[in-house]
Amino acid sequence: MKELTVKRKGILTEESLKLWFLQKGYSVSVPIGDDDRYDFIVDFDGKLVKMQSKTSNLTRTVDCLNFATASIKYNASGTHRTQYTINDIDYFCTMHPETKQVYIVPVDICGNECNLRFTPPKNGQKKGVKMAEDYEGDKMIERILNS
């Protein structure tokens, strides 16, 4: 089987996430073209939320799910990395590559990348640590609906 390109992996992630929201009973809207900073909008009972889908990878130790939180464009003058802000999107949305668990993470708590941990750090650090269970899709939908 032919290996998937980065672009195709991104398309599969985005389409899988849109389907997940549809299966939950929420409407999904998509902008025309690819000129917007968000990938799609989810209508949570009248609350419109801009989502940016991101393909995630497991870290080598398999205790973290990692995804980039910037868009990268390539052209003749080089590589251009642009951070997402609260003006661009509301949430990043990703899916575990094996279990297909969906995670929804607020843009304003992410830096250059996001690591969602499945186990606490061995050194006991708590500051800046994002536990994956706190951002599971169903839990985050409840928070969005109640905010």
PLM region descriptions:
Residues 1-36, 42-147:
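Mixed-charge (Asp/Glu-Lys/Arg
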